[in-house]
């Protein structure tokens, strides 16, 4: 068994698609109309056959509450791995991404956290 799709709640699918592709550099894999919303998945440019990230609308009240609560508590919604965190931090800062935590060594890993502008904090990690 393997993970093929994982999701992240977003406030606005179009805004999320723009942020995740133009700022972070992910590639749109699927964009299928499904009534009021769309099934939008993204993949890493380095692993286009790998795990897909679904931009899930947060329309359900439980999803909205969950997203608001973890954001207000400063908890990242998900984590992305990077080879060189300082290089990635600098690249994202140049693109206007707002970080809530600068690169910080924590034991064997270094982490940084940014705001995805769609209601989430995202952690990047270098192992």
Swiss-Prot record:
Residue ranges of every copy of the VOC domain listed in the record = 1-127
CDD domains attached to this UniProt entry: VOC_like (cd07263)
Domain of life according to the entry: Bacteria
| Record has Lyase as a keyword | yes
Xref: Gene3D superfamilies: 2,3-Dihydroxybiphenyl 1,2-Dioxygenase, domain 1 (3.10.180.10)
For this entry, list what GO says about its biological process.
L-methylmalonyl-CoA metabolic process
Q: Per its record, what are the GO molecular function terms?
A: lyase activity; methylmalonyl-CoA epimerase activity
The alphabetical list of record keywords is:
Lyase
Please tell me whether the keyword Lyase is annotated for this protein: yes
Q: Which family does it belong to?
A: Belongs to the glyoxalase I family.
Name recorded for this polypeptide: Uncharacterized protein YurT
Q: Organism, per UniProt?
A: Bacillus subtilis (strain 168)
């Amino acid at each position: 068994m393997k993970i093929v799709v994982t999701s992240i709640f977003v406030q606005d699918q179009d805004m999320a698609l723009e942020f995740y592709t133009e700022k972070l550099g992910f590639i749109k894999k699927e964009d299928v109309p499904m009534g009021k919303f769309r099934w939008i998945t993204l993949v890493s440019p380095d692993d286009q056959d790998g795990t897909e990230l679904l931009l899930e609308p947060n329309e359900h009240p439980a999803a909205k509450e969950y997203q608001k609560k973890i954001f207000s508590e400063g908890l990242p919604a998900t984590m992305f791995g990077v080879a060189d965190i300082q290089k990635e931090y600098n690249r994202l800062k140049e693109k206007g991404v707002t970080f809530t935590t600068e690169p910080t060594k924590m034991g064997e890993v270094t982490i940084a956290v940014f705001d995805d502008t769609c209601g989430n904090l995202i952690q990047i990690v270098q192992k």
